[in-house]
């Protein structure tokens, strides 16, 4: 089976690599929606750079639920999670 190339960045092919069925906790849906609306400055700046496939035609999800967690950004086609630490992480135990 030939691997599908998602995009090419500076002549380097980026191949698809994703998990078909990630765990999902529907009770976190409202929290994820609230986090999307209230994003911290770093997340908002990052989102402005990558939304609408503007970064090498790669589709990013924001505040994606994976299991019992909400990750800042997720690229399904790559199986890639991006967490941007903000002030809130200083107060969690």
Where are the regions a protein language model picked out?
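Nucleic-acid endo/exonuclease domains
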Residues: 1-93
């Amino acid at each position: 089976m030939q691997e599908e190339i998602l995009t090419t960045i500076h002549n380097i092919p980026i191949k698809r690599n994703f998990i078909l069925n990630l765990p999902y906790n529907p009770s976190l849906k409202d929290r994820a929606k609230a986090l999307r609306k209230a994003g911290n400055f770093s997340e908002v700046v990052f989102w402005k750079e990558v939304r609408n496939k503007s970064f090498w035609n790669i589709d990013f999800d924001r505040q994606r639920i994976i299991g019992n967690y909400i990750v800042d950004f997720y690229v399904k086609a790559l199986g890639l999670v991006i967490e941007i630490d903000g002030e809130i992480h200083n107060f969690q135990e």
